[in-house]
Amino acid sequence: MEKELKVRTKLLTKEYSLAQTRIDKLKTLFSVFQNKVPTFWALKGVSLDVYSGETIGIIGLNGSGKSTLSNIISGITPQTSGELEINGEVSIISIGAGLNNNLTGRENIRMKCLMLGEKNKEIDAKIDDIIEFSELGVFIDQPVKTYSSGMRAKLGFSIAVHQNPDILVIDEALSVGDQTFYNKGLKKMLAFKEQGKTIFFVSHSIQQVEQICDRVAWMHYGDLRAFGETKHILKEYRAFLHRYNHFTEPQKESYQRDGKAKQRNFSLEQLQETILEKANQQVGSRRTTKEVIKFTTKNKIGDKMTLGTKSLLILLLCMIFYVSLTFVKGISLTTAFIHPAETIQRIFVPEKVAGKDTNAVKTTKTKPASTKESRQQEEVQPSPTNVPENNNSEQAVSTYTVEVGDSVSLIAENHGLTIEQLQTLNPEIIEVPIYPGQVLKLKEVTE
């Protein structure tokens, strides 16, 4: 009977940004800035086919890309480029993955099952089996934040294996448990395998991988260094570990630096060239070239954004900046959006507005002592420019520079005017609020 293809990856890559500031993270959304932000390639072109009923071990040193590969297969992390084909429902088990620290173990069981689309009746029917399998006992009603790593792994494993997934991804979940629970988990995994389910087993334990897995993928600093039968791959891996463990500490550090440097300096162009060289431009090379370009085309969030989307994002950022400035300046949002030109002038040109009339007479905010004193001052120093024609009463014209905290009513009151009179002299304040630095015309009315 021919086995069904369950998982296929073609030239999977995963690039992570090493941006340290928010501005750098924002730059990664736009291709014009992307080359200026350092990156790190956790995967550098991983291709493998996995069939139903297979248990695949994923091994490698720390930082080799094991968890990144398992997260992409489980749908947690999107790939940067390459093709991923999944035929079936995937469930991932890692230490504490998806658990809410503030909820109890029992509440986490219900929450995760609900998130997977199960109904309360279905959950009630199997929650006791999950609790019994987890071996947590009375601790099932304690907050998960009080659990040890082994207890968290037991809970996560118990929930996942009771979901009946087609593809099970186990990321170090059995490495922290005791031998009794490991044997129970192993028995469950073998039962899944007999049912034709596919299992990905990520582990540092060569013994566990040797006991469980049919084939092994050896990850090495983002590369799939080898993929094949467990016996042959583990023989190569043990030989590598023997050499590596005999390195001095400086030699190990140098080896790790070289591997990580290659991950930082990797590019999709390099991957294209390497694959095309292997193809040797044989018959059908045009098709091969087309496929290689397709699978090595970056598929990042910023590249998916259309010009319109990017323009909208820039507009949104400008709007946030504009609203922030109006808030700092004490301008209402209604005014800011109804009269944007005047608002921008208030925000960016207050000093210039204040300096329009350097010879203007700046009056104080205090109310004049009396109309009589004003009349005496006018009689002593009459000004022909301050006496309008065809007016029976004497009037003095002056200016006032608006200060912080002023209002139209306060200025009018302090200078013996009504609001209507002040608005008549300064019609621009009828619709647009006053702002600090604005120069207003005043006419103090006297009898």
UniProtKB/Swiss-Prot annotation:
The UniProt entry's GO CC annotations, sorted and at most eight, read: plasma membrane
Bias class Polar residues marks the residues at 360-369, 379-393
Q: What is the enzyme's class at the highest EC level?
A: translocase
Coarsely, its chief localization is: membrane
Under the heading CDD domains, the entry gives: ABC_KpsT_Wzt, LysM
Q: Which cysteines are joined by disulfide bonds?
A: none
A Pfam match is ABC_tran
- Domain of life of the native organism: Bacteria
Q: Name one GO molecular function term.
A: ABC-type teichoic acid transporter activity
The entry's localization annotation reads: Cell membrane
Task: List, for all copies, the residue spans of the domain called LysM.
Answer: 398-442
Among InterPro entries, the record links this protein to:
AAA+_ATPase (IPR003593), ABC_transporter-like_ATP-bd (IPR003439), ABC_transporter-like_CS (IPR017871), ABC_transpr_TagH-like (IPR015860), Bact_Polysacc_Export_ATP-bd (IPR050683), LysM_dom (IPR018392), LysM_dom_sf (IPR036779), P-loop_NTPase (IPR027417)
Q: What is its EC number?
A: 7.5.2.4
Q: Which residues bind ATP?
A: G60, L61, N62, G63, S64, G65, K66, S67
Q: PROSITE patterns under this entry? A: ABC_TRANSPORTER_1, ABC_TRANSPORTER_2, LYSM, TAGH
Domain ABC transporter residues, every copy: 24-246
Catalytic activities: ATP + H2O + teichoic acidSide 1 = ADP + phosphate + teichoic acidSide 2
Q: Where is this region: Disordered?
A: 359-393
Residue ranges of the region described as Unknown: 247-447
**Topology in the lipid bilayer:** Peripheral membrane protein
Could you give the subunit structure recorded for this chain? The complex is composed of two ATP-binding proteins (TagH) and two transmembrane proteins (TagG).
Question: What is this protein for, i.e. what is its function?
Answer: Part of the ABC transporter complex TagGH involved in teichoic acids export. Responsible for energy coupling to the transport system.
Recorded protein name is: Teichoic acids export ATP-binding protein TagH
What organism is listed for this UniProt entry? Enterococcus faecalis (strain ATCC 700802 / V583)
Underlying gene: tagH
